[in-house]
């Protein structure tokens, strides 16, 4: 607003360039769209990201391995430690997850599709779009159902509306159901260039519409014989294919098993923390939000209620927690399990006045190591955060825990995926579980070889331990990563998680 008022508004007289409007250090480059959106003002000429590539050197560790080293690793004093790691590209010249956002926001052609066509704005100064191939697609609940190729010739500096004969919704969605329909158009290279092969995607646009012909009837639960036992230390439901155990002493679910394959090592734990990013360190987030590091991890159970459901075919359990913060803020975790071993899980935070904004809120779940595949319907394919969503597509994507652990020069928060509708966590054979958003909500998730504390403690990638588990995070919310600078600028207010507002994680778990 200040930039617009002083330089770009009615009183502006000169072109305006932001020398360094984004500092891309570590998991960063959040809020970049707030600056690129200023292109709507004729006097705005853009700005610069600091910078293109991390600066780091390969260093022999003396044990036959190498690591990317930074300030202080060569016994240099004084130094700026990892402050050389501020690139959109990693030091080995591979793209970081931030590149997904930068590429889309810097695209010279803007595509805005809807149900009947696409509006194309060509911001190039000299070249038309004649040499590009445009592909239109329709996805229903993330699955491509139709596509067609087009050649649109939009002159430089022009905006043109092009009609597209997308299929009718009634031809795609059953009249007795509901779905999320995504209309997508992308621009690709029709021929190879010196810098990219034919078919390389330059930019894309999506429009998402929710359609429903549903009569409101709930899906029937299909289940065989189930044995419900509420006596002893655990209450459980046992079937011929699996079991769910809800502890009366441990504060949650202690077994979630199908065909002998266990998904729980310890009951899922509350989390109100994330491994600090470089921007978090630079703006003092660790000091300001120190209480949240321990609040979830050391929360204590203050009440437990486990009983059969009214029909006698299921179980429900409510666990009351106190966070380990100054006010002992209450959190409620509720499980309800039906005869098909479908678990409805909610985690509710009521809000706490006069507290620093939360880094994150939800659950962190330790899984056996073999469950290292993540397939999800949400924003991807790369990691996304509340202030870094514009480069992501809505679709179904497959990742591994190792792939999602971005090798930032200093280990930190990584791998988060926003606006997730469902996620499947499986082994190499497809065995595992599915997490589905419930209650009209979305959730954020990550699956990594390391816990948040492991990432927080390591100073280099080679200091992370040998993976022995995978760590699943299911979050109601996580704050953005920021990116204005790495020496004081906070995450913009609209991308923080206010402590005085209620939060609720609402999901269904299925084996």
Give a label for each model feature.
Residues 1-115, 119, 123-130, 135-137, ...:
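Extended substrate-binding grooves/exosites of carbohydrate-active enzymes
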Residues 20, 47, 102, 120, ...:
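Conserved structural-core and active-site-/substrate-pathway-adjacent residues in large, well-folded domains
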Residues 46-52, 149-151, 375-380:
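A generic structural motif
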Residues 51, 138-140, 189, 367, ...:
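Residue-level signal for short segments within beta-strands and strand-turn junctions
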Residues 71, 87, 199, 379-380, ...:
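Glycine-centered small-residue hotspots that permit tight backbone geometry or close packing
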Residues 118-153, 160-165, 176-190:
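Beta-strand-rich binding/interaction modules
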Residues 146-148, 200-205:
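Extracellular and select intracellular beta-sandwich modules with Ser/Thr-enriched
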Residues 166-178, 193, 207-511:
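Beta-strand/loop-rich accessory regions of lumenal/periplasmic or secreted enzymes
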């Amino acid at each position: 607003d200040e930039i617009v008022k002083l330089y770009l508004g009615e009183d502006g007289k000169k072109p305006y360039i932001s020398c360094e409007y984004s500092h891309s250090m570590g998991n960063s480059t959040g809020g970049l769209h707030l600056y690129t959106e200023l292109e709507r003002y004729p006097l705005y000429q853009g700005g610069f990201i600091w910078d293109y590539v991390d600066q780091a050197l390969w260093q022999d560790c003396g044990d036959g391995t190498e690591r990317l080293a930074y300030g202080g690793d060569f016994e240099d004093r004084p130094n700026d430690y990892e402050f050389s790691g501020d690139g959109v590209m990693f030091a080995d010249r591979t793209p970081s997850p931030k590149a997904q956002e930068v590429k889309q926001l810097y695209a010279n052609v803007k595509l805005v599709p809807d149900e009947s066509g696409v509006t194309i704005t060509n911001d190039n100064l000299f070249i038309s779009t004649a040499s590009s191939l445009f592909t239109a697609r329709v996805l229903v609940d993330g699955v491509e159902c139709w596509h067609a190729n087009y050649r649109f010739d939009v002159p430089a500096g022009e905006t043109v509306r092009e009609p597209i004969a997308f299929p009718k919704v009634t031809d795609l969605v059953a009249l007795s159901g509901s779905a999320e329909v995504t209309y997508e158009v992308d621009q690709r290279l029709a021929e190879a260039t010196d810098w990219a092969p034919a078919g390389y995607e330059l930019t894309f646009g999506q429009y998402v519409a929710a359609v429903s012909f549903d009569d409101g009837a709930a899906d029937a639960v299909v289940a065989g014989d189930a044995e419900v036992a509420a006596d002893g230390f655990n209450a459980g439901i046992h079937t011929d294919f699996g079991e769910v155990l809800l502890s009366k002493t441990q504060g949650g679910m202690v077994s979630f098993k199908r065909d002998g394959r266990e998904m729980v090592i310890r009951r899922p734990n509350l989390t109100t923390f994330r491994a600090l990013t470089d921007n978090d360190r630079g703006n003092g987030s660790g000091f300001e939000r120190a209480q949240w590091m321990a609040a979830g991890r050391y929360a204590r159970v203050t009440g437990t209620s486990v009983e059969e459901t009214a029909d006698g075919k299921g179980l429900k359990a409510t666990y009351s927690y106190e966070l380990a913060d100054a006010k002992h803020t209450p959190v409620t975790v509720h499980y309800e399990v039906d005869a098909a071993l479908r678990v409805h899980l909610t985690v509710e935070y009521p809000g706490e006045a006069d507290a620093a904004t939360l880094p994150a809120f939800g659950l962190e779940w330790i899984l056996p190591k073999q469950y290292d595949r993540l397939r999800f319907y949400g924003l991807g394919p790369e990691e996304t955060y509340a202030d870094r969503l514009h480069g992501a597509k809505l679709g179904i994507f497959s990742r591994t825990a190792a792939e999602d652990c971005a090798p930032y020069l200093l280990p930190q928060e990584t791998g988060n995926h926003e606006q997730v509708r469902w996620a499947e966590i499986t082994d190499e054979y497809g065995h595992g579980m599915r997490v589905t958003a419930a209650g009209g909500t979305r959730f954020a998730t990550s699956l990594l070889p390391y816990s948040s504390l492991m990432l927080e403690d390591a100073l280099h990638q080679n200091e992370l331990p040998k993976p022995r588990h995978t760590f699943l995070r299911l979050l109601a919310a996580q704050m953005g990563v920021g990116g204005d600078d790495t020496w004081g600028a906070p995450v913009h207010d609209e991308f923080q998680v206010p402590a005085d507002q209620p939060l609720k994680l609402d999901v269904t778990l299925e084996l």
